Amino acid sequence: MFPGGGKFNPRMMKQMQKMMKDFGMDAEDLKAVKVTIELEDKLLVFEKPKVQVMDMLGNKTYSITGKAKKVAKEEEKIEDVEVKVEVTEEDIDMVSNQCGVSKEEAKKALEEVNGDLAEAILKLGN
């Protein structure tokens, strides 16, 4: 690939960089600590990678060099958490007055619908 029997020297590197700039290409090394690529079923994790970004006429290409470690992808677990909403006296009074029920009934309805005023009024209105 390289002239000179495949041997590579720093002077050639400078010439290549100059040629790249002449063609509108620019390369920059990034100081990355870790790179993670998320696939459908696993993760590829590169620890201490060499990352280079090449800009070719406004299009950026990232090159990652290093040893990839395959990591199983854990399913995201979403737990149902029961949230208890604190019902205010103001809300209880509003529902009680709107529906013509006792404050205890209004409070119970508000607790059942997690403090949703409209839902509590509809529930008591039926």
From Swiss-Prot:
GO process annotations (BP): protein transport
CDD domains assigned to the protein according to its UniProt record, in alphabetical order: UBA_AeNAC
Protein name, entry field: Nascent polypeptide-associated complex protein
NCBIfam families: archaeal-type nascent polypeptide-associated complex protein
Originating gene: nac
Domain of life: Archaea
Pfam families, per database record: NAC (PF01849), UBA_HYPK (PF19026)
Organism name: Methanococcus maripaludis (strain DSM 14266 / JCM 13030 / NBRC 101832 / S2 / LL)
Residues annotated as domain NAC-A/B: 10-77
Protein's job: Contacts the emerging nascent chain on the ribosome.
Keyword Protein transport attached: yes
